[in-house]
From Swiss-Prot:
Binds 1 zinc ion. Residues 1-144 are annotated as: Deaminase. GO terms for molecular function: 5-amino-6-(5-phosphoribosylamino)uracil reductase activity; diaminohydroxyphosphoribosylaminopyrimidine deaminase activity; NADP binding; zinc ion binding. The gene is ribD. It comes from Bacillus amyloliquefaciens. SUPFAM superfamilies: Cytidine deaminase-like (SSF53927), Dihydrofolate reductase-like (SSF53597). It catalyses: 2,5-diamino-6-hydroxy-4-(5-phosphoribosylamino)-pyrimidine + H2O + H(+) = 5-amino-6-(5-phospho-D-ribosylamino)uracil + NH4(+); 5-amino-6-(5-phospho-D-ribitylamino)uracil + NADP(+) = 5-amino-6-(5-phospho-D-ribosylamino)uracil + NADPH + H(+). Zn(2+) binds at residues 49, 74, 83. This is Riboflavin biosynthesis protein RibD. PROSITE patterns: CYT_DCMP_DEAMINASES_1, CYT_DCMP_DEAMINASES_2. Its cofactor is Zn(2+). Converts 2,5-diamino-6-(ribosylamino)-4(3h)-pyrimidinone 5'-phosphate into 5-amino-6-(ribosylamino)-2,4(1h,3h)-pyrimidinedione 5'-phosphate. Pfam families: dCMP_cyt_deam_1, RibD_C.
Amino acid sequence: MEEYYMNTAIELARRGEGQTQPNPLVGAVVVKKRQIVGMGAHLQYGEAHAEVHAINMAGSLAKGADLYVTLEPCSHYGKTPPCAELIMKSGIKRVFIAVEDPNPLVAGKGITMLEEAGIEVKTGLLRQQAEELNKMFLHFMRTGLPYVTLKAAASLDGKTATETGDSKWITSEAARLDAQQYRKSHQRILVGAGTVKADNPSLTCRLPDAVKQPVRVILDTKLTVPETANVLTDGAAPTWIFTAAGSDVRKKDRLTALGIKVFTLETDRIHIPEVLSILAENGIMSVYVEGGASVHGSFVKAGCFDELHFYFAPILIGGTLAPSLISGEGFQSMKDVPHLQFTQITQIGPDIKLTAIPKDGKDGDDVYRNR
């Protein structure tokens, strides 16, 4: 039954997906005499935490009850008071925590507060599932870098468009809808200037339940993106541009006047680790990279990705000049290429979605998540 209660808390936490960052996804359940008497989830950044909703719902029944929570309760004052204090005041006798919070503001302090108050604390229940739930938050807190997901759609022979650039549409509507879920769950959508010039995308989440739009990030070495592009003019979401030293200063001023945030790097090329460091400094914990091929190649070459989503359609495009999934410098030796482990293979309509994470190809250790 303990696993059932924690799984219920995990499912509750999912309701806040795409709405709580930079906060984690958290769900909580209050149980008394084997009955759920309170439940809650953190649904939006700045609003009440899961434990608050669950304990308030339980009311007086919280006294002597058990609390199941997906992440260690906070112990500090932020936008809301510390949940650990509320738990102590409520009379909860036992707390089951799936994962400890690596945030330096918490990092075991919540557990210590509860234990010093005489509350029994047990950790690790459904740890793996809870880690997966909050992989972006946990990765950011542990490494100081955003969680990076690479996404691409291609024909079965790995082509993302025909030789003429025609790419609408390679994959089915069902596959494109699936990708929208990840636009919702990531804080930033990133593409290169070539994608903007070729497709003029809006790069927004079109799901009806999307509470807020991810900020659009454009990598544009020479600041060549058209000033009439949708991402600069539609007002649907903020847009950030990373450009290299020597790019057009007057154009930068015009873009800034439009409300576009422009980051000018000190080098004549855009280095992916530097981009991620700047994003991290701005509190960004997740990035959804949608290409194009040279951008994907840069992330792969730099070893700067944590997950990969490739959608393959049952079509063949061919053509020597037709663009492929990944371009750029590539690798000169097989001993240097990144090895991946498939975590999921799913059929979505007529298409196949491959989900993978980087591995070193030897002992199964994840080489990029701890970079």
